Amino acid sequence: MSATGKTVLRVENVTMQFGGVVAIDNLSMEVHEGEIVALIGPNGAGKTTAFNCITGVYEPTNGAVYFDDQLIAVNHPSGRMKRAYAGQNGTMYAGKHVHLTPDKITKRGIARTFQNIRLWSSMTVFENVLTAKHMRAKQNVFSSTFRGNAKEEKRMREETMTLLVEQGLDKYKDERATSLPYGLQRRLEIARALATNPKLLLLDEPAAGMNPQETQELARFIHEIRDKYGLTIFLIEHHMDLVMRISDYIYVIDFGSEIAQGVPKDVQNNQRVIDAYLGVVEDE
């Protein structure tokens, strides 16, 4: 699948401060439909903070985030904004702020996984994915059948099973999620994100803790789900072989600011990137 050119995600002049610490500094990025885009940089560069601003975990100190041409976050305190921001129905947000919560952003069509796997440990593989579907539909996994909604419950269970089959997890459906091998837990976490029917999937270090064989399989898997489900994928990753192999475009940040962007070959040969990051990775 090639990118269509339509901008799915736009991060515009976003700054995130924690007290006197600037974690993200005037960061701007675009992700286009159908792309696999990577955000890379040294530990502590602000990558996960950027994802937290996109997904509503944090409210940006300054700047705006658009998803599908609609504002999901904007904050320009009086006297600091450089322009007015137009939201849905032409509403202007100069000097104001908008901050959608993570659940509302998920409903809009953004799903996310985390660096540290966050499966529901007391649930089976099937229950993990089904519960994600119910959360997307704002239904309770245990009560929907008792509210006269048995038909909808049946549909969700069938869709859950279909998703598990598609992801090669069906034979583990009755096993406790945390009993799976590490690579399969990663796959389950992604399957759970897919259960929310996202348009944009954010992956935070999906290859963390994987061996080379699992990482190679992950590269194939990411391309497969992008094509199968018509996804746009934005990922944070430290495995440079994986990043260079699967990414259409790469942003590089250091100390919260962009130091480079471009296609993999250009980024790989950028001296600032080599000095700040790639040289360190190669020495490890």
Go through each PLM region and give its residues.
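Glycine-rich phosphate-binding loops of nucleotide-dependent enzymes
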Residues: 2-284
